[in-house]
Amino acid sequence: MAAQKIRSANTNGLPRCKSEGALIDFSGVPDPSLSEVKVLSPSSLRIDNPASLENVKEVVAIKDYCPNNFTTLKFSKGEHLYVLDASGGDWWYAHNTTEMGYIPSSYVQPLNYRDSCLSDSGMIDGLLESVDEGVKELDLLGDWTNSSNQDSVKKCHNNPFLRPSVSNPFLNGPLVPQTHTADTENSVDLLLFDPLAPSHAIASETSTDVLLDLLPNTSQNEVTVPVKRDNPFFRSKRSYSLSELSVLQAKSESPTTGSFFAGLKSPAPEQFQSREDFRTAWLNHRKLARSCHDLDLLGQNPGWGQTQPVETSIVCRLDSSGGAVQLPDTSISILVPEKHVASGETQQISLKALLDPPLELNNDKCTTVSPVLEIKLSNMDVQSPLTLEVRISVALGGNASALNMVGIKCLRSDAKEGPYNSVTQIYMYGDTVQVKLDNLEPVMYVVMVAQGQGIVSPSSVWEYINKKVTVGLYGPKHIHPSFKAVIVIFGHDCAPKSLLVNEVGQQANKSAPVTLQLWGKQQFVLPKPQDLQLCLFSNMTNYRVDAGDQGKMVRGFQLKLGKVSRLIFPITCQDSAQLSDFTLRVQVRDEAGGVLSQYCVQTPQPPPKTGSKSTGPRRFLKKKEVGKIVLSPLALTYKYPTFQDRPVTSLKYGKLIKTVVRQSKNPYLLEYKKGDVIGLLSEEKIRLKGQLWNKEWYIGYYQGKLGLVHAKNVLVVGKVKPSFFSGPELTTGLLLEQILRPCKFLTYIYASVRTLLMENIGSWRCFADALGYGNLPLSYFCRVELESETERVASVLEKLKEECNSEGKEKKSFQKELIMALLKIDCQGLVVRLIQDFVLLTTAVEVASRWRELAEKLARVSKQQMEGYEAPHRDRNGMLDSEAMWKPAYDFLLTWSAQIGESYRDVIQELHTGLDKMRSPITKRWKHLTGTLIFVNSLDILRAAAFSTQEPEDCII
C-alpha cells in the first residue's frame, strides 16, 4: 500500500513489503540499474539512525493538512517532514519518522529553499534525464543546509530550457560546462506512478520558471554573469530567470558560421527602455524560435521532433446574448444564459480539461468519472449562474443496492488540490450530467465523481458501478523508419488530440519532450482496478513492434488512483525502402489473460518527399502497393474471435411523425406509418439526395427491415425500448444479413482479392470454417500438399469461387459469401479495404463514358488532366474504345480517393454526393451505392455487438 504505516517501534530490521512503485514492471526499460533500486526498511527510518536519512530531504510544513484519504499523510504547520520522492509534481512521497504517505507540495517548503532544485511552485522543473539520474536526483543537491559549500556543479538537464537538444534551436548546448558527475546511487523508496510520464506541471504549464539560483556558488566563478543585479527588469523572480537565461545563452554559445539559426539571437534587456518593450521582444523571439524545427534533432530521431504541446482547452468571449462554450473533441460544454452579463459587457470563459485528478478524489469510496475541469471567468459582475454539461464515463449497477449505495456527485473547489465540496444543484439524464454553477469565482475546479455511502472495507465503490476507461494510441504526425507509439489509459473519456510525452531512459538525453497526435481511441468497461497488459501488433511483417506481443503492464493501483498511464512501444521498419502506412492493433488483457478491449488504428502516411512529383496519371495498383492501407485487425495471428448471434442492445428509438409511401420503390429507403416506433442504429446522419434535393437520413430498423429514414420525420425519444415496438428483434445475425444485400451487385477483380487475402489471413482453417467448410480436410480444397499457409488460404478462396460459379448447386454470390466470412472472423479492416475497391471499380464501370462529368463534380479536374488519364489507354490511332472507358475512370477514382484520406466512409459518402450532382444521376437506377453507404456506417455497431466481451446489457460501442 502506498501509504503503508511504518512504526518506529518495529526494530526487527526486516524489509517491508514492496511499495507499488517497486512493483512496476521495468523489464521493457533498457537501463539495468532499475532492477537495483532498493526499498527502505522500517529500521532504516529510525531517528536514532541518522546515517539512514542522508538520502532524504527535509522540508517544513507552512500550513496544516488534514487528509481524507488513506494514501496521504497528516501534518501540522511547522512540522518537519522528509521527502523520499519529489517526481510526482503536485504530490510528494514523504515520511515523518512514524508513517509514510503523500503530501501536497504546495503545503511545504524546503529548508534553505533558494539553493534547492525545487521551484517556488513546489514542482521539479523538468523530468530526469535518465533512470540513473532518477535515483541520483532524489538526493536533491545533497545536504540542503550546506548546499553552498558543495564543490560539484549540479547538472541542469532537468531544466527544459537547458537541455542539450530541444525543439528551440537557439537553446542548443549546455549553459554551464559539466565538471563533476552526480553522486552514486542511493537506496531510496522509489514510488513511480508512471515511469514514462512527465509531471502535470510539465504537461500543462509553460516551462518558464527557471532559477539561476539552481547553480551552486562555485559555478559563479566559472561563468561571468553579464547582467547587473540592480537592473529593474530583474526585480521579479520570473523575469530574472527568463532574461538572464537568454543573455547567458547568447554569451555562452557562438552560433556556427553560416548556420540557418545564426540570425536567431535572443534580445538583451539593456537594449530596451522599459520592461514591457523587453517582454514583447522576448516573446516575439521565442515564438519565432519555436516555429523553427531543430534539423539536427529531426535527423537523429525521426518521428520525435514534431512540435510544441497543445492544451485541451478553449477560450471564448461572449456578450449579453449568451451562448455555449464547448471543449473541443469532448462532450463537455458550458451554457451561458441570455443577460448573464449586463448589456455592453462581455464575459471571457476559459475551459480546460486536466488529465490527472487530485490524489484525494480516488479511493475505496470515491472515484472520478470525468476530467477535472478548470473554469476561469473574467467578469464577476454577473446576473445569472452558468450551466455545466458533462458526459460521464460510468453507469450505475442495475440492482437496487447499487442505486442506494452509490451516487453521482459534482465536486467543486477554488484550488486544484482541494478541498472539494459537493454541488447540490445537479441533474442527470442518461450518461449526461447538468450542474448549475452559482457563487461564481474567477477560477473554479469542477469534477464528477461516483461516491459511495456506507461502504465498508474491503468493499469499494467499484463493486457498484460499471466504470469506463479510455485507451488511446498516440504517435507522430508522420511515420519514419524508426519511431515510437504510445498507448495511454485515461480514467475518463476525454482523450486529448495531442499529448506531451517524455521518455525516461538511456536515450532521454537525445530527444526532447514532444507532442504526439491521437491516432485512435476506444472505451471499455473496467470491472475492477486490476493489473492490465497492453499489447500492440502490426499487420505487416515489415514493421516490428518491440515487446508488442508480450505487452507492457499497467498496475491496478494506478487505475484506482485515476492516474494517466503512458506506455511507449518502439516501432522499426525492417526495409526502409518499403516505408508506407500500416495498421496497428491495440489489445488490452486482464489479469487472467482475457481480452477486455481491442481495436485497430491506421497509421499516418510517411512525410511527403521534397523531390519533384510525377504529374502523370496514377495507374492500376502495383502488387507491392496493395498492402499499404490494409486495415486488417488480426493479420498474422491465428486465433480469431467467434461471431455471436445476439440482440443489438445499443439501438436508440424514435417516433415517426409522418407517413411515407414511395411511388418509385427503393430497397434502401424505408416506408413507414405515422405514430409507429422505429429503431435507430445511431444518431449519425448520412447525406443523400431524395426525390428533389439533398437530405439528412438516419439508418433505421422498421418492421424487420433496415434502411434509411428522413431525419426530419423522426422524433428521437431515447434508448429505452417502447413496449409497443413492433416487428422482430434486431440481432447481429439479422443485421449482418441486411447490410450484405448490396454486396452481390458490386464488381471485383479476382486477382486483387486473392492477393489481399493471402497477405492478411493467417489461418486457412479459420477462414474455411467461416465460409461453412467446417471439418473438411485440406485435401478437399487442393489436390497436392501445400506447405505455405498463404497458398492454403488461396486454395480455399479458389474453392469458394468454383462453387459460386457452378450451375449445379444453389446459386451463391462470391462477394457476399466472402464478406460475410471475413466479418464473422472480425476482419473488418480487410472488409472495408475490399469494399472500397469494389465500389470504386463498380462506379467506374457504371459511369464509363460519363466519367469526365463525375471528375468535374468531385475534383474539378481540368481538360488537360482528363486527357492525361485517357492517354495510356488509347490505341495506336489515338482512339479510346467506349468499352475501355472504365479504365481512365478507375484511374481517376483511385487517385481521388487517395487524396480524400484514409476514411472509407468519407470516400463512399463523397462519391455518392458527387454522383447525385450529375445530370440524370446514375444513382437513380443504380441504387446499390446507397446500400453500400448503409453497410460501412453499420459495421461498428455490428462489431461491437457481435464481438463484445461484456454481457449484452453492458455492451460498449
Curated annotation (Swiss-Prot):
Q: Which GO terms describe its molecular function?
A: GDP-dissociation inhibitor activity
Organism of provenance = Xenopus laevis
Q: Which InterPro entries match?
A: DEATH_SH3BP4, SH3-like_dom_sf, SH3_domain, SH3BP4_C, SH3BP4_SH3, UPA_SH3BP4, ZU5_dom
Per the record, GO CC terms? clathrin-coated pit; clathrin-coated vesicle; cytoplasm; nucleus
Q: What is this protein called?
A: SH3 domain-binding protein 4-B
Q: Which GO terms describe its biological process?
A: cellular response to amino acid stimulus; endocytosis; negative regulation of cell growth; negative regulation of cell population proliferation; negative regulation of GTPase activity; negative regulation of TOR signaling; positive regulation of autophagy; protein localization to lysosome
- PANTHER family reported in the protein's UniProt record: SH3 DOMAIN-BINDING PROTEIN 4, SH3 DOMAIN-CONTAINING PROTEIN
Q: Where in the cell is it found?
A: Membrane, Clathrin-coated pit; Cytoplasmic vesicle, Clathrin-coated vesicle; Nucleus
